[in-house]
């Protein structure tokens, strides 16, 4: 995963370049 902190919801998403560029709330916004 990226160097940025991740949320439980973000962990559920497959690791990719996108997850490294989006903010911490990625899982929630998605």
UniProtKB/Swiss-Prot annotation:
Alphabetized GO MF terms: translation elongation factor activity
Alphabetical UniProt keywords: Elongation factor, Protein biosynthesis
Extent of the signal sequence: none
UniProt function note: EF-1-beta and EF-1-delta stimulate the exchange of GDP bound to EF-1-alpha to GTP.
Entry's family note: Belongs to the EF-1-beta/EF-1-delta family.
Subunit details: EF-1 is composed of 4 subunits: alpha, beta (1B-alpha=beta'), delta (1B-beta), and gamma (1B-gamma).
Name of the protein in its database record: Elongation factor 1-delta
Organism: Populus euphratica
Species lineage: Eukaryota, Viridiplantae, Streptophyta, Embryophyta, Tracheophyta
């Amino acid at each position: 995963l990226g160097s940025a902190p991740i949320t439980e919801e973000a962990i559920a998403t497959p690791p990719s370049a996108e997850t490294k560029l989006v903010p911490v709330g990625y899982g929630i916004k998605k």
